[in-house]
């Protein structure tokens, strides 16, 4: 009887709190990328250009990039459950303001406010998930939490796009705010109060990392390799409508197909990067660069364009786990006192990449046209290929 009671208690203290974290991750993942499917309707309704609407993605990314390391350090002394609840309040407020926005300026501010909750959530969420389970199940617990992000890409973004097309883009943001309400209730009820508190993050630890060459190189690889795809992905809906020739009503279905490709790629990428992340990343980036270049030539053809876009999705997020493992491995080797801070800074690097990619994509759309976004994104990813080769050379010499 006692063993059964302990098993039930273990499930309560592990699986259910992880579900609450996954719900939060699903909401955050949905709000980050859902504007991709709504760019055209947002631009038309607010009477702005597609390029300006693209700032809703790059602006959000910069909010995460600057907010993650700075706010993680500033809030390090707060109780982790209290901080988790505060982050979801910010998330709800940000999306509610977005839904009420009548101007582009207010909508952009709302997006940046929402972004502040993103970076810190994934910084503390991973450590909370790890502490909820036995040590030999920590990796699985963290993976379960991040499943919320994958599910958001597969279902949240296409569903949000469908809702936006059927009822207007404001309805999508109200729906995401409702997700935040569900997440905060789940966190309040299911996440335990007696969480082990992590040691405070220090700005001095961030400075140590920023002085380390191999880690700085890995952040540059993250920004270029992950961000290059966003030169085209940010404008995927206009590409599908204006180049490939799909009706706006078909975009949500195609984003669902893209999301399935992302989910498959995530699974493959995690397994491929287990033994030698640098080698795996080199080949992932090289193939992705080639696919992006090909897309510029196939985008105007429905069948070939759709197949190439699916392939782009397959590779787009395949590198994420490898990039995270690479940074953690390097931090443990060079700056062992600041592994968590290095992980937070890599989240910032991901979002710097998104911001750069989205911004560059906007410049291309305005200057030489939508069809050129994929191959220029491919050039950006090719930069990551070269940096990865350099990093492999450095690590080989260090052995």
Where do the protein language model's features map onto the residues?
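Helix-to-loop junctions at the C-terminal end of transmembrane segments
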Residues: 68-79, 265-277, 365
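Extracytoplasmic
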Residues: 17-50, 68, 232-237
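Paired small-residue
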Residues: 90-97, 102-114, 303-311
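Conserved MFS/SLC helix-loop-helix module at the cytosolic interface between two early adjacent transmembrane helices
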Residues: 66-105
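A late C-terminal transmembrane helix in Major Facilitator Superfamily
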Residues: 330-368
């Amino acid at each position: 009887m006692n063993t059964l009671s302990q098993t039930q208690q273990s499930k309560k203290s592990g699986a259910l709190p992880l579900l609450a974290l996954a719900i939060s991750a699903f909401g955050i993942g949905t709000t980050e990328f859902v504007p991709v499917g709504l760019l055209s309707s947002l631009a038309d309704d607010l009477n702005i250009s597609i390029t300006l609407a693209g700032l809703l993605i790059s602006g959000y990314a910069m909010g995460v990039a600057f907010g993650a390391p700075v706010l993680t350090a500033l809030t390090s002394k707060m109780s982790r459950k209290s901080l988790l609840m505060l982050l979801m309040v910010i998330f709800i407020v940000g999306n509610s303001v977005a839904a009420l926005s009548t101007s582009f300026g207010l909508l952009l501010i709302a997006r940046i406010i929402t972004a502040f909750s993103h970076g810190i959530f994934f910084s503390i969420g991973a450590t909370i998930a790890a502490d909820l389970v036995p040590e030999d199940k920590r990796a699985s617990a963290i993976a379960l939490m991040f499943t919320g992000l994958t599910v958001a890409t597969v279902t949240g973004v296409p569903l949000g796009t469908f809702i936006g097309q059927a009822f207007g883009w404001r309805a999508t943001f109200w729906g995401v705010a409702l997700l935040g309400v569900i997440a905060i209730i789940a966190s309040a009820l299911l996440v335990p109060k007696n969480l082990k508190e992590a040691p405070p993050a220090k700005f001095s630890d961030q400075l140590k990392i920023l002085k380390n060459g191999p880690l700085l190189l890995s952040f540059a690889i993250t920004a270029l390799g992950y961000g290059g795809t966003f030169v085209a992905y940010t404008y995927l809906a206009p590409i599908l409508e204006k180049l490939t020739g799909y009706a706006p009503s078909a975009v949500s279905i195609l984003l669902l197909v893209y999301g399935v490709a992302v989910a498959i790629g995530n699974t493959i990428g995690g397994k491929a990067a287990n033994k030698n992340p640098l080698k795996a990343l080199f080949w992932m980036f090289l193939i992705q660069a080639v696919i992006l270049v090909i897309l510029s030539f196939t985008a105007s053809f429905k069948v070939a364009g759709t197949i190439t876009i699916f392939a782009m999705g397959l590779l787009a997020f395949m590198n994420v786990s490898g990039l995270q493992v690479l940074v953690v491995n390097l931090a443990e080797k060079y700056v062992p006192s600041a592994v968590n801070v290095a992980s937070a800074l890599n989240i910032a690097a991901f979002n710097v990449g998104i911001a750069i990619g989205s911004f560059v994509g906007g410049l291309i759309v305005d200057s030489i046209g939508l069809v050129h976004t994929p191959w220029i994104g491919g050039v950006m990813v090719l930069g990551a290929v070269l940096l990865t080769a350099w990093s492999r050379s450095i690590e080989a010499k260090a052995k």
